[in-house]
UniProtKB/Swiss-Prot annotation:
Belongs to the asfivirus C257R family. This is Transmembrane protein C257L. The chain crosses the membrane at residues 123-143, 163-183. Keywords: Host membrane, Late protein, Membrane, Transmembrane, Transmembrane helix, Virion. The keyword Transmembrane helix applies. It is a multi-pass membrane protein.
């Protein structure tokens, strides 16, 4: 029973013939037709193209996606006849296929299409190009291999120049959204503070209408001698003369004196 990785490795083994027939390529001498295993690369390339068309506003989007699906179905039938198994096109994508490939240097499984497994440049010569990371193929000559190994091919989908503008727009919208929320909250806080200040001023203005304002009986602000003033009538009711205390507290003259 074949697995997806078996199919992928078969395709890699035949990849040097995938561009045939081509008189300019020495390996194509006498080859009249590309091996059916190359359908794996066809599907991967179509999946990449399909992914890009899904997120376009082009009026031909529906028509293009329909044609791509038909082409994928043709290659899927070819692979089914060859291996006798149903292969999901979603399993034949560049970033998934990398799990099945073998490191040319160490023999380890997994990694990305760049200087390590089935070379990205080799695929381009054959007419199949995995979506390059941001910066395009220039990055593969400008950066050392150790750096490239840290970039999983899964990110190829999202860090390529064609898709980067899409994510930059999303990032810009997020930044603008955060800025809008911060400005809105700041304005709301200022509005609340201003409203509270207006309420305090209105409250003070109402209090200033007290008929006893600026007298010893004013109700605002609170009188610190209030308790003593309340005790004086109590003592006077018992017959004491509280004239001196009334004078000190600013109270009018009372009885018993």
């Amino acid at each position: 029973m074949y697995s997806v990785c078996d199919v992928v490795r078969d395709a890699v083994a035949q990849s040097h013939l995938c561009a045939c027939p081509n008189d300019k390529l020495p390996q194509c001498k006498g080859v009249t037709k590309a091996p059916p295993e190359c359908s794996v690369f066809h599907v991967a390339k179509l999946q990449d193209t399909k992914f890009k068309w899904k997120y376009t506003l082009d009026p031909l989007k529906a028509q293009k996606l329909n044609q791509i699906n038909k082409d994928i179905e043709k290659d899927a039938i070819t692979l089914k006849l060859l291996y006798g198994i149903e292969l999901s096109p979603e399993d034949l994508e560049w970033w998934k296929m990398q799990r099945c490939l073998i490191n040319k240097k160490t023999g380890a499984k997994g990694g990305q299409f760049a200087n390590k497994y089935l070379e990205r440049q080799d695929l381009e010569l054959l007419g199949y190009s995995p979506t390059p990371i941001i910066g395009g193929d220039f990055m593969f000559t400008a950066l050392p291999d150790k750096v490239l190994r840290t970039i999983p091919i899964a990110w190829d989908r999202f860090l390529n120049p064609a898709m980067m503008i899409f994510f930059l727009i999303i990032l810009l919208c997020v930044i603008l959204g955060i800025f809008y929320v911060l400005v809105r909250n700041t304005l709301r806080r200022k509005q609340k503070i201003k409203q509270h200040q207006m309420e305090i001023k209105r409250f003070i203005k109402e209090k200033e209408q007290d008929p006893y304002i600026h007298t010893s009986f004013e109700s605002w602000p609170a009188d610190p001698n209030k308790e003593w003033k309340e005790l004086i009538p109590v003592y006077e009711a018992q017959g004491y003369c509280m004239a001196d205390y009334r004078k000190k507290l600013g109270m009018p003259p009372g009885p018993n004196c």
